[in-house]
Regions:
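Active-site loop-to-helix "anion-binding N-cap" substructures in soluble metabolic enzymes
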Residues: 1-244
């Protein structure tokens, strides 16, 4: 919950000027709902995609304060973050409720950025793979293979976000490899190999290159570093360097 519409617009202007017309790295910005209209106009003629931070599973109805997939589509939103760790922690979202949102998103031709990840307590208890496995399997129930081109998965080790603790490149890769294995079991090896799996555990300019060099880490779900255009663009540069 950061940035007013004016602040969001200024940030996107800076990102547009710094990223130029490069197309090698796909860039998506996900401002608060209140900033979507102004940011939509800013990215319309650029290579930057527009995403939202959440949505409701129902297309319409008496759900005060919620936003539907079609409302997002009307603002030219292409991506939507679903199941973020903060939504799970503070708003009680479950694997089942997140699954409903994921299906609603693809039915509206939105790209769900489907978030998974374990807490510190779960990691220290050795339950990481069990927790992440359940989140993937239950969160993607009835997901059609025909819509796999829309699916993006984001691994957020909750224990590494704003805690001072960090996941090593190897620790992150280990979970990403397991996630891809589970996706392979659900959708087949060939399909799983093409699904993007992002890392969302406090990626920043200092650690981006090492993380993005891992074979199963396909990008980043950037948190605090995205509030600075320089930090955000430095991460984009790190991504470009791994393609060289």
């Amino acid at each position: 919950m950061n940035l007013t519409p004016d602040e969001s617009a200024a940030l996107v202007d800076e990102i547009n000027s710094l990223t130029g017309s490069q197309t090698s790295v796909q860039v998506c910005v996900c401002p608060p709902f209140t900033s979507l209209p102004v940011v939509s106009s800013k990215v319309e003629q650029s290579e930057v995609h527009l995403g939202a931070q959440n949505m409701h599973a129902e297309p319409s109805g008496a759900f005060t304060g919620e936003v539907s997939a079609e409302m997002l589509r009307s603002l030219y939103v292409s991506h939507v973050i679903l199941g973020h760790s903060e939504r799970r922690q503070y708003f009680g979202e479950t694997n089942a409720s997140i699954n409903s949102k994921v299906i609603a998103a693809i039915n509206a031709n939105l790209r769900p950025v489907f978030c998974i990840g374990e807490t510190l307590e779960e990691r220290e208890a050795g339950k990481t793979m069990d927790v992440v496995g359940a989140q993937v399997r239950e969160g993607l129930v009835n997901y059609p293979s025909s819509a796999l081109d829309l699916l993006v998965v984001a691994y957020e080790p909750v224990w590494a976000i704003g805690t001072g603790k960090t996941a090593t490149n190897e620790m992150a890769q280990e979970v990403h490899r397991e996630v891809r294995k589970i996706l392979s079991e659900i959708f087949g090896e060939s399909a799983a190999s093409s699904i993007r799996i992002l890392y969302g555990g406090s990626m920043k300019p200092e650690n981006a290159a090492g993380l993005l060099a891992q074979p199963d880490i396909d990008g980043g779900l950037i948190g605090g570093a995205s509030l600075s255009s320089k930090s955000f663009c430095d991460i984009i540069e790190a991504a470009l360097s791994t393609q060289a």
